A protein has these predicted regions:
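A small-residue-rich subset of transmembrane alpha-helices
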Residues: 57, 185-201, 211-224
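Transmembrane helix boundary and interhelical junction motifs in multipass membrane proteins
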Residues: 26-35, 160-170
Length: 260
C-alpha cells in the first residue's frame, strides 16, 4: 500500500502541472485555476494551502514563459509594467473588498470563463497583427493599460484567482493586442502577481507540503516551457486553435473534477 502513497501525489501533481503548464504557456492562464481544485479534490488538501502551492507553481512557470516570449519579441514590457503596477495596487483593494462580502467561492465562475474563452478562440481567432498594434499612440495605450490593470486587479483580488483569463480577454479584445503578445504580456504580469499571492499565502497559512509543492512547481515549469516554445513558433491561426482547445479541455476537466 505504501508505494501507492508516494505514487498517487506524483500522478495528481503531474496532471495538475501539465494542465497548468500548458494553460500558462499557451494562454497565460493562472496555474491556480487548475492546480488548486485538483489538489483539493484528490489529495484532500486545505484550499488555502492548495492555492498557495498553485501560485508558487505559477511564479516560475510564468517567468519561464515570459522569458520565452520576450526572446521572440512577443512581450510588451513598457505597458506590461504600467499595467502590472495598477494590477498589484488594485488586487489589494479587491481582496479587501472581498473580505467585506460573505465568502463564496467564485471558483466556478472563473472556470466557466476559461471554458467560454476557449470556445471564443476556436470560433473567432484573434487575428490582429503587430503592425496594427503599433498604430495606437503611446499615451492612449498607457492610459488603456492603467484602466485595464485596475479592472483586472479588482477582479483578481476579489475572486482570488490570478486574473490570467481576464487579462487575456482584456488584452485581446479591449486593447487589441495580437495573441502572442497578449499571452507574453499576461504571463509577465502574472509572474509578479502570483509571487505576491504565494508569499502572502505562506505567511498566513504556514509552510506547504514540500513534496507536493516541489512536484507541482517542476511539472508546471516543464509543461509551460514546452507550450511557450511551441506557441512562439506557431502561426497565429494554429495558436488560437491550440489555445482554445487547451482552455476548453481545462475548463471541462476542472468542472468535471469539481462536480463529480
Amino acid at each position: 500500500m505504501h508505494e501507492m502513497n508516494v505514487l498517487f501525489p506524483v500522478l495528481v501533481t503531474f496532471f495538475a502541472g501539465m494542465g497548468a503548464g500548458l494553460g500558462t504557456g499557451f494562454a497565460g492562464m493562472s496555474a491556480a485555476a487548475v492546480i488548486s481544485p485538483m489538489l483539493i479534490t484528490f489529495l484532500g488538501m486545505d484550499p488555502y494551502m492548495a492555492v498557495g502551492i498553485a501560485l508558487s507553481s505559477d511564479v516560475l512557470a510564468s517567468a519561464v514563459s515570459a522569458y520565452t516570449y520576450h526572446k521572440n519579441q512577443n512581450l510588451d514590457v513598457k505597458n506590461g509594467l504600467v499595467m502590472m503596477a495598477s494590477v498589484l495596487g488594485f488586487t489589494v483593494v479587491g481582496s479587501w473588498l472581498a473580505s467585506l462580502v460573505p465568502s463564496r467561492t467564485m471558483g466556478g465562475f472563473s472556470v466557466f470563463m476559461t471554458f467560454l474563452l476557449g470556445i471564443k478562440f476556436i470560433v473567432k481567432p484573434v487575428m490582429t497583427t503587430k503592425e496594427a498594434m503599433q498604430g495606437i499612440s503611446a499615451k492612449k495605450r498607457a492610459i488603456q493599460s492603467i484602466v485595464c490593470g485596475v479592472i483586472i486587479g479588482l477582479i483578481c483580488g476579489f475572486v482570488g484567482a490570478g486574473g490570467g483569463m481576464m487579462m487575456l480577454l482584456i488584452l485581446t479584445s479591449v486593447l487589441g493586442y495580437e495573441l502572442k503578445t497578449a499571452v507574453g504580456t499576461s504571463v509577465f504580469i502574472m509572474t509578479f502577481t502570483a509571487l505576491t499571492g504565494a508569499v502572502s499565502h505562506f505567511m498566513i497559512g504556514g509552510t506547504p507540503d514540500w513534496l507536493v509543492w516541489g512536484l507541482c512547481v517542476v511539472f508546471t515549469l516543464l509543461w509551460a516551457r514546452i507550450a511557450a516554445v511551441f506557441a512562439n513558433k506557431a502561426a497565429p491561426k494554429t495558436l488560437n486553435r491550440a489555445t482554445g482547445v487547451v482552455l476548453v479541455i481545462l475548463g471541462v476537466a476542472i468542472l468535471g473534477v469539481k462536480y463529480l
